[in-house]
Structure formats: structure tokens, C-alpha cells
């Protein structure tokens, strides 16, 4: 799947608010903007405007993941998500994907703590079971445990988000970073060597001129 960062943030907010503030759901464009840009329970913090959010809603609608849902007499357009219906997801699966969309890669322990308002998991074993089910469907993947980490982390596979940790945890990206970091010093050394050679040539030219000036008149 190839949802972009704005789509993922908008979708995550629709899923979250449907469950945490059902009396205010569906959401208006302004309510979605506030939800997307709030500074709690969001990683990274963003500042999307209504135009960006509206365009993301249109892309989500084309995927069949959201739709306009204004009721009779409503003065503002409101939107709801169709993601769970489109993918046939249960409440436990939605809760985990929602947190991964809004907060980036998480450990099972973090998911157990942060899904409390979205779904009543019976414990960490239930989190693991749900993650296994999502992984089997190609919706999440387990990331390599980094040195010093006690738990593995999981990320969603719905698209590309803005979490730098995604690239840092990805084995492919990590390898690319290592190659880039090793290539940088080598390139720098080559430039320094070239500059040193140029300086040596300039010194030789100046020395030649000095000898010529000091010759017999």
C-alpha cells in the first residue's frame, strides 16, 4: 500500500476520534485539522492546513477508506472513515493500526499502554496475537531489534509516514545509511588530497617566480 503521510495522519485521526469522542464524530474539516495537528499522542507533530487535509480526504475516498458523511441540516461538511469495513478489520486490529499511524513504530508494551482508549485488550498476549494476525495479512511488520532495545518494534505497511525511525529501523535503510556514512569520509579524503595537490602546485609556481625575480639584472 502507498498511502502518503497526510492520508495516514487523517485516517488515524478519524479512527481515533470515532472511538474516543463518538459524540463529535463524523468530523468536520476544522476538527480534523485540530486532530491532525494536536501535540499529544502524535509523532511527529505536524502542521497541516485544511487544503492539505481536504486533498488527503479525496485520496482516501478514492481508496474506499473514507467518505463525506454530512447529516441533514449540517452546515459543515463532515467525514467518516470506511477503512475497517474496506479491509474487514476487527476492533483490536483497528486499535493497533491507529496507534501505529499516529505515533510511528511501537513495541508491544507501548501498544498495550496506548490502545487503552481504543480497545480493551486482555493483556500483552492479546497484543502479540493481533500483531501476528496483522503481519500475516501484510499490514504490519516486525523491525529488527536495535542494540540496547529490550523489545522488538512493529510498524504498519499502509504507506510512507514521516517517522524518521522507520528508515532507521528498516534493515535496507540501515544498510544504505551505513554505506552512505562510509562513503562520505572517502569522498572527503579525495577532495582534501586534490586540494593539497593544488596547494603544492601553487607553491611550486610561486617559488619559480621568486627565483626568476631574484636572478641577475
Go through each PLM region and give its residues:
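Hydrophobic residues on short alpha-helical segments
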Residues: 7, 11-14, 33, 93-100
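Amphipathic alpha-helical oligomerization/assembly segments
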Residues: 178-213
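Short acidic, hydrophobic short linear motifs in intrinsically disordered regions
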Residues: 21-45, 105-121
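N-terminal positioning helix adjacent to the helix-turn-helix/winged-helix DNA-binding module
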Residues: 6, 28, 89-92, 191
Amino acid at each position: 500500500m502507498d498511502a502518503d503521510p497526510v492520508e495516514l495522519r487523517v485516517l488515524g485521526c478519524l479512527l481515533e476520534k470515532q472511538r474516543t469522542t463518538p459524540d463529535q464524530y463524523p468530523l468536520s474539516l476544522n476538527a480534523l485539522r485540530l486532530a491532525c495537528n494536536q501535540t499529544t499522542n502524535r509523532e511527529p507533530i505536524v502542521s497541516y492546513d485544511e487544503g492539505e487535509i481536504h486533498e488527503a480526504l479525496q485520496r482516501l475516498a478514492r481508496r474506499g477508506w473514507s467518505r463525506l458523511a454530512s447529516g441533514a441540516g449540517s452546515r459543515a461538511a463532515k467525514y467518516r472513515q470506511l477503512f475497517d469495513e474496506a479491509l474487514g478489520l476487527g476492533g483490536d486490529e483497528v486499535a493497533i493500526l491507529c496507534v501505529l499511524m499516529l505515533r510511528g513504530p511501537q513495541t508491544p508494551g507501548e501498544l498495550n499502554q496506548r490502545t487503552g482508549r481504543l480497545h480493551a485488550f486482555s493483556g500483552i498476549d492479546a497484543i502479540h496475537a493481533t500483531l501476528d494476525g496483522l503481519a500475516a495479512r501484510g499490514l504490519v511488520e516486525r523491525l529488527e531489534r536495535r542494540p540496547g532495545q529490550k523489545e522488538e518494534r512493529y510498524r504498519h505497511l499502509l504507506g510512507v509516514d514521516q517517522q524518521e525511525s522507520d528508515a532507521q529501523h528498516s534493515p535496507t535503510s540501515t544498510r544504505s545509511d551505513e554505506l552512505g556514512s562510509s562513503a562520505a569520509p572517502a569522498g572527503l579524503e579525495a577532495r582534501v588530497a586534490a586540494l593539497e595537490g593544488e596547494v603544492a602546485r601553487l607553491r611550486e609556481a610561486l617559488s619559480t617566480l621568486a627565483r626568476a625575480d631574484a636572478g641577475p639584472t
